[in-house]
Amino acid sequence: SAGISCAIGGDDTYRLLPYLMEDEEFIKAVEEHPKLFTGFSDTTINHLMFYKLGLSTYYGPNFICDLGEIADEMLPYTKRAFESYLEGNESDEIISSDTWYEEREDFSRAAIGTERKTHKEERGFELLQGSEIFQGGLLGGCLESLYDVLTNSRYEDEKEVCERYDLFPNKEEWIGKILFIETCEEKPTPELFEREVLLLKEKGVFDVVNGVLVGKPQDEAYYQEYKDILIRVIDNEKLPIVYNVNFGHAMPRCALQYGAVAKVDMKQKKIYVNR
């Protein structure tokens, strides 16, 4: 096959690690036969595993949520991201979508062919602080998944399993990177969001990255609260933070390639990615 699209997330994805990271045949296949790999949410675990093995993957559309969209057509902005995989371009240009969509509440047969509720994008990419232009290699994922990797908040053995394979990048690996993070469909409360951001701070991530990209919250849940927490907890006014980027759980979504060098230009309100 030419590539793999994850079906959806999978909150116990970490349980795959012993079966894959100790399989020499699998590791050799990753090295010798690299393939396109795309997905988001708890797929973050897979992305970090492949990143460790040297494969550059895409935090982007998945099968059920995007290719399986129950409206008549895939969302145009997301479709463009998916098509970019197939075109093989050496660079990509990401702009804000002019429309955002609410998450569906009805996934029954009766909803087939119905359109999502839409809203005009009023804000676009927001520079919360720091330089208007910055660049670095892309690294990150779903904030809740990263938190789960570092704690036993969801499963009692997840932290131990992930530590065994050094899944979370060490501080040196974050140097010069652009951290990208986004919140999941559970719409974490501001209190939980603060704990999650604080944990990344305690790991020293914000001391060494060149900037932060934050995805639009699904349905714009806690939109202002999250902004306030990011600025207060990170507490480094020189670190660029760009908010409301179209990736992750909110519809529509672009694709961010792990390890690819991105140049964020907020004068142009664009993100340029060299693959």
Segment roles from a protein language model:
Residues S1-E31:
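N-terminal small/polar loop signature for handling phosphorylated ligands or for N-terminal nucleophile
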Residues I4, D42, L146, V212, ...:
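Buried hydrophobic positions in well-ordered alpha/beta secondary-structure cores of metabolic enzymes
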Residues S5, T38, I178-E182, L213:
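Structural motif
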Residues L20-F50, S56-I64, P240:
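Short, acidic/small-residue loops that bind anionic groups at enzyme active sites
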Residues T43-E90, N236, V245-R275:
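Peripheral docking tails and interdomain loops at the edges
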Residues S56-E144:
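Conserved anion/nucleotide-ligand pocket segment
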Residues G137-P190:
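Oxyanion-binding "anion nests"
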Residues T183, K187-R275:
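C-terminal active-site/capping subdomain that shapes the small-molecule cofactor and substrate pocket
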